[in-house]
UniProtKB/Swiss-Prot annotation:
Encoding gene per record: rplX
Family of the protein in this entry: Belongs to the universal ribosomal protein uL24 family.
Species this chain originates from: Proteus vulgaris
GO molecular function, one term: rRNA binding
Assembly, per entry: Part of the 50S ribosomal subunit.
RNA-binding recorded as keyword: yes
Name of the featured protein: Large ribosomal subunit protein uL24
Length: 18
């Protein structure tokens, strides 16, 4: 289960977009 990894990647992507 790579939920934490996915969430971490999503958060990083969101920061990059911001």
């Amino acid at each position: 289960f790579e939920d934490g990894k996915k969430v971490r990647f999503f958060k990083s992507n969101k920061e990059t977009i911001k």
